[in-house]
A protein has these predicted regions:
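Rossmann-fold cofactor-recognition segment
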Residues: 1-5
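Active-site helix of classical SDR
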Residues: 84, 119
Length: 225
């Protein structure tokens, strides 16, 4: 998904092979490490910088390492938009569903995750707005936003090892929650369930919410990261 051309090719391949789409599950991300340095302007620029297309020449002095390309805006947001735009006509015909796998950090900001949280908030804003647009146009395409935490089999767990005390949830159970949410056309999925409470506390009781988040952080490890 780091290539601007890849999302359209992926959807077109699926349409050619399957003849149409009933579900589109978006579950990919270019991760960012947690820690004090992750909030720097340079780290954020690395996350949000789209890679040059295959037909363009990179600017002198600009070299995007593979790990940087994996964190770019193309992977974290634009590819989601491209995949959705290309698949939406087919999903409209089938009255299908969009399932967007996101993170708690796209609803509740926490410490030492500035670039990653920025990308996830952008996803929540885009698909929240798209849901409203489809509704007012009477387009019967469901959008399910999945708010997940750390999974024990996810690469993202390695990026926060030692920084957070939060326990990783079993990956298969998180996958089952996503499948159920998409199949039932639920507007939102929270796994573990307590994340729904944290999202509610964000507006109602910000101080207790901040206290809960702080308990899961290892400040000294984050400072050294």
């Amino acid at each position: 998904m780091a290539s601007p051309e890849a999302p359209e090719h992926v959807v077109q391949f699926a349409l050619d092979k399957l003849g149409g789409l009933d579900y589109l599950v978006l579950n990919h991300v270019g991760g960012a490490p947690a820690g004090m340095r992750a909030r720097s302007a340079q780290a954020t620029r690395g996350l949000l910088q789209a890679p040059p297309s295959s037909g363009s020449r990179p600017r002198p002095g600009l070299r995007l390492r593979p790990v940087t390309r994996g964190r770019c805006l193309q992977v974290n947001l634009l590819s989601y938009v491209q995949l959705t735009s290309r698949a939406l006509p087919s999903l409209t015909d089938s009255k299908g569903s969009l399932v967007v796998v996101s993170s708690l950090l796209g609803r509740v900001p926490t410490s030492f995750s500035t670039p990653y949280s920025a990308a996830k908030f952008a996803l929540d804003g885009f698909f929240g707005s798209l849901r409203r647009e489809l509704d007012v146009q009477d387009v019967d395409v469901a959008i399910t936003m999945c708010v997940l935490g750390l999974r024990d089999r996810a690469p993202a767990a390695q990026g926060v090892r030692g920084v957070t005390r939060a326990m990783a949830s079993p990956g298969p159970r998180a996958a089952l929650a996503v499948i159920r949410g998409g199949a039932t056309r639920a507007p939102g999925v929270f796994y573990p369930w307590r994340f729904h409470l944290l999202c509610l506390l964000r507006g109602w009781l910000p101080r207790p919410r901040a206290w809960f988040i702080r308990q899961d952080l290892n400040i000294s490890a984050a400072a050294a990261a």
